[in-house]
Amino acid sequence: MSVKYGKFEMPHKITVDQESPESNFARYVAEPFERGFGHTIGNALRRMMLSSLEAPAIISVRVEGIPHEYMAIEGISEDMTNIILNFKGALLRKLPTEETPRDTRILTKVVEVTQDDLDRNQGQYCVTLQDVVQEGNFEIVNPELHLFTVTKPMRRQVDLRIAFGRGYVPSERHVVRDKTSDEILVDAAFSPVRLINYFIENTRVGQDTDFDRLIMEVTTDGRITPAEALSFAVQIGLKHFEVFNQFNNYALSFDEKDGDRNGDQDELMDKLSLGIDEIELSVRSANCLTGANIETLAELVCIPERRMLEFRNFGKKSLNEIKAKLHEMSLHLGMDLSRFGVSPDNVKDKIKQYREEKKKKKELVKHEDAK
């Protein structure tokens, strides 16, 4: 049986407002949501990204000739306790697949430091993560991570046991059935997500501003990307909801009122077709936009926030002013206008076409009234 519900506002697409591969940060914007759904979706995604995502981590370290972690090592500045602490900071990337399963594996590498190595480095050779982990096994996120400092020639085998998991697992909870007597277990931080923030703002649909815009800021440690974190969290949530679908005795559909949708589009296009000189901006900000060949609001909102600061003479103060002005108009930088057929490539032509069509309609109405 099919059940028909009234119109239910849902986002059509998520836009990437800001992305920085160097810092593993991204800001995502989704709108419009019915009132309250922004918090419902945002909080659920935040909790799943912080608690449920998996990544590889070192769970044990074995250094040849070192029976326990409380031992000092001849020719190495750090004791074994500090070396273990340094290994905890290792970040390794690998997404397990059918071809590369998530089984625990041991990486073995012979670390050799010669007298020539010491002479070239003023008598102290810094062993880093890339000296211990071969690139073919895992992608090394922080290859320059300092592990220990060698002061005498040495040759020792280092074994690292790598496992996949989620959350934070202390060393005493690791289950290693083939553990050797000189293998030292390590606390493992599997969670690849460092920080998740989400914000809810009001957004406009037609004349009504009582809808939610969800803004999510995702920061990872490099073992997964922000896009992967968001995607995996969504799939985890959907998998959990599947069990509740056993009560699916009805096919639910939602009413779409074309007249309302067309009215919303006309109102938005009227707003977007405004010239930069028609909104109240400081002379400096207006001149910066004019210098960047931005003539209309449509051209402005198509630009991601990160690109704005690339414009000549454009600073944080001007950016904040423009963001505040757009917020007053229920707009924001980096908007996705594809459902209206507008993209950064055709925005000038689309706005010109809309203005011409609007002018013709006005002239037609004026002509009809004159009869």
Swiss-Prot record:
Q: Coiled-coil intervals in this record?
A: none
The protein's matches in Pfam families, at most eight in alphabetical order, are given as: RNA_pol_A_bac, RNA_pol_A_CTD, RNA_pol_L
Q: Which GO terms describe its molecular function?
A: DNA binding; DNA-directed RNA polymerase activity; protein dimerization activity
Instruction: Write down the EC number.
Output: 2.7.7.6
According to the UniProt entry, where is the signal peptide? none
Where is the segment annotated Alpha C-terminal domain (alpha-CTD)? Answer: 264-371
Q: Keyword Nucleotidyltransferase on this protein?
A: yes
SMART domains attached to this UniProt entry? RPOLD (SM00662)
Function (record text): DNA-dependent RNA polymerase catalyzes the transcription of DNA into RNA using the four ribonucleoside triphosphates as substrates.
**HAMAP family found in the cross-reference section:** RNApol_bact_RpoA (MF_00059)
Q: Which NCBIfam families match?
A: PRK05182.1-2, PRK05182.2-3, PRK05182.2-5, rpoA
Return the domain comment text from this UniProt entry.
The N-terminal domain is essential for RNAP assembly and basal transcription, whereas the C-terminal domain is involved in interaction with transcriptional regulators and with upstream promoter elements.
The name on file for this protein is DNA-directed RNA polymerase subunit alpha
Which species is this UniProt entry from? Protochlamydia amoebophila (strain UWE25)
